[in-house]
Amino acid sequence: MRGKTFRFEMQRDLVSFPLSPAVRVKLVSAGFQTAEELLEVKPSELSKEVGISKAEALETLQIIRRECLTNKPRYAGTSESHKKCTALELLEQEHTQGFIITFCSALDDILGGGVPLMKTTEICGAPGVGKTQLCMQLAVDVQIPECFGGVAGEAVFIDTEGSFMVDRVVDLATACIQHLQLIAEKHKGEEHRKALEDFTLDNILSHIYYFRCRDYTELLAQVYLLPDFLSEHSKVRLVIVDGIAFPFRHDLDDLSLRTRLLNGLAQQMISLANNHRLAVILTNQMTTKIDRNQALLVPALGESWGHAATIRLIFHWDRKQRLATLYKSPSQKECTVLFQIKPQGFRDTVVTSACSLQTEGSLSTRKRSRDPEEEL
């Protein structure tokens, strides 16, 4: 039994060991994922490859080997990550997990009610189609009080491209407040009125935690430090990484290392979503793929990355109209809907005969130029 436990522990993810955050990030950045990969590594070799002192390397190896030989291993982070549960409990979680609405009912409908908690959702699309706009919209909407159908949470916004616009967030938050005020006037309930007292512009902005990451090392460091941040901010129900591809496409030429780092990052995001009962949003760029003498736009980072997120949405254009295609979902069928971005944020649009809403044809649309007035 002890031998089986040891073999199991050697497959354990390095981020689950009680290592310092700085060492943990350096190990992952160097491409190490599991304890097994460090089994035959000497302290001097680890020091050189990871960029830490020999004393730190020796201490790291000792901690990992000691943990692997312990009959009752300890896991970093929340104890819920390894708690047993039944299929019935999982079903009940699915029914009560909650959703973050987008204010576009067509988009909410194809997602099953909105962006779901406890799942990772990837939003792909060409520049200017609305990925960052949706991220900012969700950072506001996640804070909607429960009596209005929201989840009353907070948001973490990790920005890799510098696309976050606080003035735009002010517009979205102001529109959201006005919308809820209209609902409260209709209901005339004390609960709604009291909830709006705290749902102010200042409170909304103060509960969006913004982090700017300029390269993949900073991004990995921030993501792997999130468990500590979330333990201090237990109301966070949304983590956004706006521009997951940007740092990896421009700063990393080693494709093998890039794949390992991305896989580790994806697993960390899944763990955060499950352990902290929050939604994860990842935005991705599109790249051109030549297939049978035809140029198609496909999500960046390759096919293996396509399995990382639970849900994949693709935003694209049909003439001057924006469309969203639910390309991948474990519970909803593939579907394409129209949406528009108004000064107030994401909203529904009227289907016209000129727009076919055909998924296959729409997704093969190349990048198009946009009129200046289309930009918000």
Swiss-Prot record:
Changing residue 159 to N: Reduces interaction with BRCA2 and to a lesser extent with PALB2 and RAD51. Residues 1-126 are annotated as: Required for Holliday junction resolution activity. Expressed in a variety of tissues, with highest expression in testis, heart muscle, spleen and prostate. PROSITE patterns: RECA_2. It is found in: Nucleus; Cytoplasm; Cytoplasm, Perinuclear region; Mitochondrion. Induction: Stress-induced increase in the mitochondrial levels is seen. Changing residue 258 to H: In FANCO; possibly hypomorphic allele; reduces interaction with BRCA2 and to a lesser extent with PALB2 and RAD51. Gene3D superfamilies: 5' to 3' exonuclease, C-terminal subdomain, P-loop containing nucleotide triphosphate hydrolases. SUPFAM superfamilies: P-loop containing nucleoside triphosphate hydrolases (SSF52540). The keyword DNA repair applies. GO terms for biological process: DNA recombination; DNA repair; double-strand break repair via homologous recombination; female meiosis sister chromatid cohesion; male meiosis I; meiotic DNA recombinase assembly; positive regulation of G2/M transition of mitotic cell cycle; reciprocal meiotic recombination. Transmembrane segments: none annotated. Residues 79-136 are annotated as: Interaction with RAD51B, RAD51D and XRCC3. One of its GO terms (cellular component) is nucleus. The modification Phosphoserine is found at residue 20. Part of the RAD51 paralog protein complexes BCDX2 and CX3; the complexes have a ring-like structure arranged into a flat disc around a central channel. The BCDX2 complex consits of RAD51B, RAD51C, RAD51D and XRCC2; the CX3 complex consists of RAD51C and XRCC3. The BCDX2 subcomplex RAD51B:RAD51C interacts with RAD51. Interacts with SWSAP1; involved in homologous recombination repair. Interacts directly with PALB2 which may serve as a scaffold for a HR complex containing PALB2, BRCA2, RAD51C, RAD51 and XRCC3. Interacts with HELQ. Interacts with DNA damage up-regulated protein DDUP. PANTHER family: DNA REPAIR PROTEIN RAD51 HOMOLOG 3 (PTHR46239:SF1), DNA REPAIR PROTEIN RAD51 HOMOLOG 3 RAD51C (PTHR46239). This is DNA repair protein RAD51 homolog 3. It comes from Homo sapiens. The gene is RAD51C.
